[in-house]
């Protein structure tokens, strides 16, 4: 085997996964023609066509499918070898990629990173803020945080803290428009919801075993918690917010919780889980981040006012 083709095989796997020469070129900082030449070298060496290209998509030949599967196994073996070497290190060092939901990354994880860097000066972190399913191997993820009650089978992990939601407004808004005392009172208010589906405007509450649902209305909706928080601060209405987003503004008195005696039930609630793909040969940097987040994230809930249960 020509070992000089190993980089081409790695690039070939990326091409198949991405389905685009140009996407792979951008990802690797090379030109599409360089990607095309890489495939041509492989096809010359293998003596067969690996990819069928059309104007819209790439299709693997039978030989290409076989090569792709073996190349994937080769890359996974290489990753395991590197992780195995890293697990023998006693000092946490190297680059770690951490994938987190956008709002959690902005309000929970990013504020903790400066202290992490101080504690572990030889660890570099790539914090990826993304709200999508992921594949630890294909996406190059070391650790991930996800809000779920049922982590995917095959993953290892631990819950760090519950994610609860509250509804909030400013004192100025409530003085002008009145304070709601029951969920049904919200019908007379401008409510700021997530806005991704019609169900996001149907707010559900629970108190002493009783559940109430109210159809809310408002001139503004936004699918990012920071935007909804800012809208609430600007007196635009009563907004639904994760408690981790609202906590600082509540503590400062910038906003107040509305209907605090009712539990606001959100379909986006659950536990914040720290997840990883395997326990074998774990690099010291991964263990350091797991230990650090296990220590610091649960502490964020200490002393905070949770919604009524």
From Swiss-Prot:
Pfam families referenced in this protein's UniProt entry, alphabetically: HTH_1 (PF00126), LysR_substrate (PF03466)
GO MF, one example: sequence-specific DNA binding
Transcription regulation recorded as keyword: yes
Gene3D superfamilies listed in its UniProt record: 3.40.190.290, Winged helix-like DNA-binding domain superfamily/Winged helix DNA-binding domain
Domain HTH lysR-type: 1-61
PROSITE patterns given in the database record: HTH_LYSR (PS50931)
Residue range(s) of DNA binding per entry: 21-40
Biological processes per GO annotation: DNA-templated transcription
Cell inner membrane as UniProt keyword: no
This protein's UniProt keywords: DNA-binding, Transcription, Transcription regulation
Family that this chain belongs to: Belongs to the LysR transcriptional regulatory family.
The protein's name in its UniProt record: Probable HTH-type transcriptional regulator LtrA
Organism: Klebsiella pneumoniae
Gene giving rise to this polypeptide: ltrA
